[in-house]
A protein has these predicted regions:
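Helix-loop segments that flank and shape redox-cofactor active sites
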Residues: 2, 17-42, 104-122
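Disorder-to-helix initiation segments
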Residues: 1-10, 89
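Short, small-residue-rich loop/turn micro-motifs
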Residues: 25, 72-76
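Acidic/histidine-rich alpha-helical segments that form the ligand environment
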Residues: 52, 56, 76-125
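Conserved alpha-helical segments that form or flank metal/cofactor-binding pockets of metalloenzymes
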Residues: 29, 34-71
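Long, contiguous binding/interaction regions
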Residues: 2, 33, 45, 65, ...
Length: 125
C-alpha cells in the first residue's frame, strides 16, 4: 500500500471520528454534561488539527486527500453511528475509547509500514 493510500485511510478515519465526536458533543446529557461536553469539544478540535495536517502531508507528497463524506465512509475502519436512540455519557465515552483504540491500531500499522520517514514522524505526534 502506498503512503498516499495509508494516509488517506487515516484521513478518512479522522473525518468519521471528527463527526462522531461532534455528535457526542451535541447530544450529551446528564450530570456529567459540562465535563463531557467540554471533553468532546477538546477532542474534536484536536482531531481536526490532525485531520488537516495529514491531508496537507498528502498534498505535499503529490497525492490527493480524500475530502467527501462518501470517501470517508468508504475508506474508514471507524464506522459512523447515527444517533437513533439516546446514549448515556458513559456509552459515549466507551464508544469514543473503542474508536480511538481502533485508530491507534491503524496508526501503529502505518508507522511500521514502508511509508516515508516524514509521514511516520507526523503520525507519531
Amino acid at each position: 500500500m502506498s503512503t498516499v493510500q495509508r494516509l488517506n485511510e487515516i484521513t478518512a478515519n479522522l473525518g468519521v471520528l471528527y463527526a462522531k465526536l461532534h455528535q457526542h458533543h451535541f447530544y450529551v446529557k446528564g450530570q456529567d454534561f459540562y465535563k463531557l461536553h467540554e471533553l468532546f469539544e477538546t477532542q474534536y478540535n484536536e482531531v481536526h488539527e490532525q485531520f488537516d495536517e495529514v491531508a496537507e502531508r498528502i498534498l505535499m507528497i503529490g497525492g490527493k486527500p480524500v475530502s467527501t463524506l462518501g470517501e470517508f465512509l468508504a475508506l474508514a475502519s471507524i464506522k459512523e453511528a447515527p444517533y437513533t436512540t439516546e446514549k448515556s455519557g458513559r456509552q459515549m465515552v466507551e464508544e469514543t475509547v473503542a474508536d480511538f483504540e481502533l485508530f491507534r491500531t491503524q496508526l501503529e500499522a502505518a508507522i511500521h509500514s514502508d511509508i516515508d520517514e516524514v509521514s511516520q514522524d507526523l503520525l507519531m505526534v
